[in-house]
From Swiss-Prot:
This is Thrombospondin-2. Homotrimer; disulfide-linked. Can bind to fibrinogen, fibronectin, laminin and type V collagen. Adhesive glycoprotein that mediates cell-to-cell and cell-to-matrix interactions. Residues 387-437, 443-498, 500-555 form the TSP type-1 domain. Residues 966-1178 form the TSP C-terminal domain. Residues 25-221 form the Laminin G-like domain. Residues 324-381 form the VWFC domain. GO terms for molecular function: calcium ion binding; heparin binding. Keywords: Calcium, Cell adhesion, Disulfide bond, EGF-like domain, Glycoprotein, Heparin-binding, Repeat, Signal. Residues 737-760, 852-941 are annotated as: Disordered.
């Protein structure tokens, strides 16, 4: 029985222990909130990227799309706000790695309105503070903890305590800074129609930049317990001697009461303070106790048996036979009778057995109790002294604050061996110092303007003044002064002041009334400097003055016989002689005899010339110019004499409707001047973000040149006016195989055969049965070699038969095994160097090199590649048709071996280029029927490529007529790299759109057209949310070691291969010049990834200081301007209709032109759409 009792007590003890532990766990779970979990943030959340943090079992997140961050669940938010009010605050625990010197919101509560915020916690890396911002009665309050060192790109474990009056920050186990709150802002928090977020700021600049992990809100737990759970150890002595700035009371034994003068606080939750070792010792002691109890039970049983034997020996009293009585000390006691053996033992007779027990005394509450004779228990004498047992009070502690209201404490101890010590052991009182300076840094603000002052004059024009002061508010704590002037002055007008009249200057003397013999001359003046006004006095004096003139005697006049040429001045002398002055304007001679002057010959450039032909007409006398030629505008001067001819020359300017604003382009279109020789002289192109024929433009969301809605364009419109069949995905070719109105780019089943494109082995041909004989993942119905494995489907001669199964790949009627250029059409099979490779496809046609190696990918074999290029135009000297003049395009229209750039007669028609009205077409007759300066033979097609100039992307180069990347050279920049695969390019829109589908090593798809000055534009779009790396384009490509590249990174990242050099890639647009000494390989690969300069590899010309990365599923449009002659490079990037990136003018003359191409590095599903390049060599 005793054994069962012991086991029962042990089971009760274990049950209470486990139950207490479970309650603690439930309480912790109820009062601790995982903010990422209640926000439903996981790996599927858009814009949330998974990373590995310090705790490998829990994911860390970086947010790049803050508009997709979900708020807390409403029911959880209501509970959190309720707990904040109950606990008078909260504790925030988080593990984070914040980007260096960034400013980011960690936690924010916004609402009930759309733009209202109730409070937020912001880590300000620029100011190195942790800011608590809250709003009370519409006013913003900012409290900053300083020198926190959070935004340094290092992992930090922080604990933020906002409880009562405390605002404290712990990093790890260290208290960094603290502040006393003056307002209980948490009492005004509202959950209704509100939203709480992590990482999301009120504006774009306040979003959190970095990684977050293990972010929790904790309630009903002291800051000491939170830190203890994080492994922070605090010694007992330290805890006892620490006085908290809050009004919490130290927890002592329940036997001692505490008196507190200040505000009451709720009792904090207690936790088990026994270690596992202590509990083990307790079980050992319980086992020993069980042994002792068993021994006592055995001894008691022996005593009972001995008593029974004694009872039988003595025997009962004869008179008490058949009665239940008890014997003790010779006395007989009846059944149920009780008696006191001594003062502290009481016995009772029960069924002839004596049962005794000791009297239990209640505890006394005094130090000196007294005993009354005959009584077992001591008693206290009554005393009214409440100080009994207490030590004297200690001195008051220092005030808890240095300004404002605080508290002081004092204590005393109790001698518990002498007294129960009624009353408190700690007392608290208020203390007050000078008022705290709660000022914060604030910028100055202007007061209202004062009234205008009175006018500074009583008549006429004066000034009035008003002032304002920089005192609303006054700048303080380093705040900025007010911007602007504190004084304004304006004119004021009163009645005009009287103006007295003043004489003006005398006029010249008039001609004398006679030339000799005495005459009269006069002069006059006016009272107009100024005239008398507004009651002023008139001028005093005469208005006219007379004088005698020509008083000499009259001579004999020799000019009366008109001896001089008409118009020449005749001078007569007193002796009767005469002389003639110079010939009149327009004549040459001695004054007596004059001849006509031919101004057209004397001033050869007096009139406008067309093709060096003079358009001046000489008259007698004088000259005049013919009207400006057709499509020119300007003056038609005429006159007489050299002075007029020299000063009034004819200027004829080509008509330019774009400049004159006489064009008919849409307001959202750009007028592009084509030249006065073109008909029409201009064309209209819709601006970025719009599409149409230029006369009419509509919205174009995906920037692929097709409008969102149908446009009513002109009847002869040839450009995009039809509604975009994929309005949200760039597809400039508008391919629609099944004609269902939905473009192939966004149609999940292009051929309507019931098999989605990503699973269809013939996505553009109806084949529901999906037969594939050769297992090359190309269906038999669309396989150009159905019985030969050829997944690439290359068909060089475009005859429908793939190269893998064709006996004549290039279609030149020479079988492959006998064709020395199997992939190039060459019927003559010429092979000058006899290396077995035909001249048409030989990269060294004059030097034996059967292996055809080309290490630098410049289309010149290594055997004959000397890389000597004095003019830096990408063509080595012995292959350059102008070795000393840069001409990357190598244009040579008369095929004489001398490039146009250094050929004085490009068409070899005997007319020098500067006088040839068709510089690129043979026309020795120079016929020009309309006299506009452009020869008839090249009127609308200057380069004779059968493409009208208005549609020709290079109207002065017959080798290039349209944008076309259908044929390109694939250049792997890390050909031996094993980290990823090579790029995979898909061609669309007749080479005006390319899609790169693979997550690849760095590579270029470079076209074969070559350019000097060029404009290059295209639409950039990433059709996936996977990865965040580089894409862009190249220009001035001369080899895989020499080119310019514009590359765009989504997020900042260190390259995963840190050999041979460590590479840091920053988000944003970078413009780089590659001039590698090693060529393709891992050195160039890491240098391209790195944002900065790598000696001997890459030099960064410009990086966008805003570090804006591209976004998934967003269309961008780039525009490049490159002028190698001056070194000008300029790049614009549009997002929608707005310019997002503008490099401004950058100058670099490393390379004088080259080829264009597209670039990718570790980024898949990149769309390059609506590509367009135009020559700008003119």
């Amino acid at each position: 029985m005793l054994q069962r009792s012991r086991l029962l007590w042990l089971a009760v003890f274990i049950t209470l222990w486990v139950s207490s532990d479970a309650q603690d766990d439930a309480k912790e779970e109820e009062n601790t909130f995982d903010l990422l979990q209640i926000s439903n943030i996981n790996r599927k959340t858009i814009g949330a990227k998974l990373f590995r943090g310090p705790d490998p079992a829990i994911p860390a997140y970086r947010f790049i799309r803050f508009d997709h961050i979900p708020p807390f669940k409403p029911e959880k938010l209501k509970k959190i706000v309720k707990l904040i009010r109950q606990n008078e605050g909260f504790i925030l625990s988080a593990t984070l790695r914040q980007d260096r010197q960034s400013r980011g919101t960690i936690l924010a509560l916004e609402g009930p309105g759309i733009s209202e915020r109730q409070f937020e916690i912001i880590s300000n890396g620029r100011a190195n503070t942790l800011d608590l911002i809250y709003w009370v009665d519409g006013f913003q309050n900012v409290i900053s903890l300083e020198d926190v060192d959070l935004a340094d790109s290092q992992w930090k474990n922080l604990t933020v305590q906002v409880t009562g009056e405390n605002y404290n920050l712990y990093v790890g186990c260290d208290l960094i800074d603290s502040f006393i709150l003056e307002e209980p802002f948490y009492e005004q928090l509202k959950a209704e129609n509100s939203r709480m977020y992590v990482a999301k700021g009120s504006i774009r600049e306040n979003h959190f930049r970095g990684l977050l992990q293990n972010i929790h809100l904790i309630f009903d737990t002291s800051i000491e317990d939170v830190l203890r759970k994080k492994g922070c150890q605090r010694s007992q002595s330290t805890e006892v001697n620490t006085i908290n700035e809050s009004t919490e009371i130290l927890h002592l034994s329940p036997a001692v009461t505490t008196e507190y003068v200040g505000e009451k606080t709720e009792k904090k939750a207690e936790f088990c303070d026994r270690s596992c070792e202590e509990l083990g010792t307790m079980f050992t002691e319980l086992t020993g106790l069980r042994i002792v109890v068993n021994n006592l039970a055995d001894n008691l049983q022996k005593v009972s048996e001995e008593n029974q034997i004694m009872w039988e020996l003595i025997g009962p009293n004869k008179t008490l036979k058949n009665q239940s009585v008890c014997w003790q000390d010779g006395r007989v006691f009846a059944d149920s009778e009780s008696w006191i053996v001594d003062s502290c033992t009481k016995c009772t007779c029960q069924d002839s057995k004596i049962v005794c027990h000791q009297i239990t005394c209640p505890p006394v509450s005094c130090a000196d109790p007294s005993f009354i004779e005959g009584e077992c228990c001591p008693v206290c004498s009554h005393s009214d002294d409440s100080e009994e047992g207490w030590s004297p009070w200690s001195d008051w502690t220092k005030c808890s604050v240095t300004c404002g209201s605080g508290t002081q404490m004092r204590g005393r101890s109790c001698d518990v061996t002498r007294s129960a010590c009624t009353g408190p052991h700690i007392q608290t009182r208020m203390c007050s110092f000078k008022k705290c300076d709660h000022r914060i840094r604030q910028d100055g603000g202007w007061s209202h303007w004062s009234p205008w002052s009175s006018c500074s004059v009583t008549c006429g024009v004066g000034n009035i003044t008003r002032i304002r002061l920089c005192n609303s508010p006054i700048p303080q704590m380093g705040g900025k002064n007010c911007v602007g002037n504190g004084r304004e002055t304006e004119k004021c007008e009163k009645a005009p002041c009287p103006v007295n009249g003043q004489w003006g200057p005398w006029s010249p003397w008039s001609a004398c009334t006679v030339t000799c013999g005495g005459g009269i001359r006069e002069r006059s003046r006016l009272c107009n400097s100024p005239e008398p006004q507004y009651g002023g006095k008139p001028c005093v004096g005469d208005t006219k003055q007379h004088d005698m003139c020509n008083k000499r005697d009259c001579p004999i006049d020799g000019c009366l016989s008109n001896p001089c040429f008409p118009g020449a001045e005749c001078n007569s002398y007193p002796d009767g002689s005469w002389s003639c002055g110079p010939c009149p304007a327009g004549f040459l001679g001695n004054g007596t005899v004059c001849e006509d002057l031919d101004e057209c010959i004397a001033v050869s450039d007096v009139c406008f010339k067309v093709n060096q032909v003079h358009r001046c007409v000489n008259t007698n006398p004088g000259f005049h110019c013919l009207p400006c030629p057709p499509r020119y505008k300007g003056s038609q001067p005429y006159g007489v004499g050299l002075e007029v001819a020299k000063t009034e020359k004819q200027v004829c300017e080509p008509e330019n409707p774009c400049k004159d604003k006489t064009h008919s382009c849409h307001k959202s279109a750009e007028c592009i001047y084509l030249g006065h020789f073109s008909d029409p002289m201009y064309k209209c192109e819709c601006r970025t973000g719009y599409a149409g024929d230029g006369r009419i433009c509509g919205e174009d969301s995906d920037l692929d040149g097709w409008p969102n809605n149908n446009l009513v364009c002109a009847a002869n419109a040839t450009y995009h006016c039809v509604k975009d069949n994929c309005p949200l995905l760039p597809n400039s070719g508008q391919e629609d195989f099944d004609k269902d109105g939905k473009g192939d780019a966004c149609d999940e089943d292009d051929d309507n055969d019931g098999v989605e494109d990503d699973k269809d082995n013939c996505p553009l041909l109806f084949n529901p049965r999906q037969f594939d004989y050769d297992k090359d993942e190309v269906g038999d119905r669309c396989d150009n070699c159905p019985y030969v494995h050829n997944p690439a489907q290359i068909d060089t001669d475009n005859n429908g038969e793939g190269d893998s199964c064709a006996v004549d790949i290039d279609g030149d009627d020479i079988f492959n095994e006998r064709d020395n250029c199997p992939y190039v059409y060459n019927t003559d099979q010429s092979d000058t160097d006899g290396d077995g490779v035909g001249d048409q496809c030989d990269n060294c046609p004059l030097m034996h090199n059967p292996d055809q190696t080309d290490a630098d990918n410049d289309l010149v074999g290594d055997q004959c590649d000397n890389n000597e290029d004095i003019d830096e135009d990408g063509h080595q000297n012995n292959q350059d048709n102008c070795p000393y003049i840069p001409n990357a395009n190598q244009a040579d229209h008369d095929k004489d071996g001398k490039g146009d750039a250094c050929d004085p007669d490009d068409d070899n028609d005997g007319i020098p280029d500067d006088r040839d009205n068709c510089r690129l077409r043979y026309n020795p007759e120079q016929e020009d029927s309309d006299g506009d300066g452009r020869g008839d033979i090249c009127k609308d097609d200057f380069d004779d490529d059968n493409v009208p100039d208005i549609f020709d992307v290079c109207p002065e180069n017959n080798a290039i007529s349209e944008t076309d990347f259908r044929k390109f050279q694939m250049v792997p920049l890390d050909p031996k790299g094993t980290a990823q695969i090579d790029p995979n390019w898909v061609i669309r829109h007749q080479g005006k759109e390319l899609v790169q589908t693979a997550n690849s090593d760095p590579g270029i798809a470079v076209g074969y057209d070559e350019f000097s000055s060029v404009d290059f534009s295209g639409t950039f779009y990433v059709n996936t949310d996977r990865d965040d790396d580089y894409a862009g384009f190249v220009f001035g490509y001369q080899s895989s070691s020499r080119f310019y590249v514009l590359m765009w990174k989504q997020v900042t990242q260190t390259y995963w291969e840190d050999k041979p050099t460590r590479a840091y890639g920053y988000s944003g647009v970078s413009l780089k010049v590659v001039n590698s000494t090693t060529g393709t390989g891992e050195h160039l690969r890491n240098a391209l990834w790195h944002t900065g300069n790598t000696p001997g590899q890459v030099r960064t010309l410009w990086h966008d200081p805003k570090n804006i990365g591209w976004k998934d599923y967003t269309a961008y449009r780039w525009h490049l301007i490159h002028r190698p002659k001056t070194g000008l490079i300029k790049v614009l990037v549009y997002e929608g209709k707005q310019v997002m990136v503008d490099s401004g003018p950058i100058y670099d003359t490393t390379f004088a032109g080259g080829r264009l191409g597209l670039f990718v590095f570790s980024q898949e599903m990149v769309y390059f759409s609506d590509l367009k390049y135009e020559c700008r060599d003119a």
